[in-house]
């Protein structure tokens, strides 16, 4: 499972809105998973079970974004890839999941940086 932690100098509600916009603009479905977590999905789960990673862009992926507050009041976003959806596609699915996570971690960092609120990514 891949993970990136973003430290952001903005209120948590503003950050949640920006993150939601980044992913919905890219055709992800964004749904609340718990009070502090958004689940993002894209692709077709049933077809991915049948055809695996050969589904191309329609391959089902599910990832999570956890929101919290750091020790100095900064907003923390933990962006996690999911191994569950990747297992559907075997080794190719795992590779696709990790590659997609890296791609969107970069897009999220760019969106936050363009607003001059990104403090760090680790």
Task: Outline where the language-model segments fall.
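Ser/Thr-rich, low-complexity intrinsically disordered terminal regions
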Residues: 1-122
């Amino acid at each position: 499972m891949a993970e990136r932690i973003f430290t952001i100098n903005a209120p948590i509600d503003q950050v949640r809105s920006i993150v939601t916009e980044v992913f919905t603009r890219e055709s992800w479905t964004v749904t609340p998973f718990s009070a502090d977590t958004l689940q993002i999905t894209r692709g077709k789960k049933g077809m991915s079970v049948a055809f695996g990673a050969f589904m191309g862009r329609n391959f089902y992926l599910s990832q999570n974004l956890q929101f919290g507050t750091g020790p100095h009041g900064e907003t923390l976003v933990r962006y996690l890839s999911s191994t569950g959806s990747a297992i559907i596609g075997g080794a190719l699915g795992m590779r696709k999941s990790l590659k997609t996570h890296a791609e969107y971690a970069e897009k999220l960092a760019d969106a936050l940086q363009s607003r001059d609120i990104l403090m760090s990514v680790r």
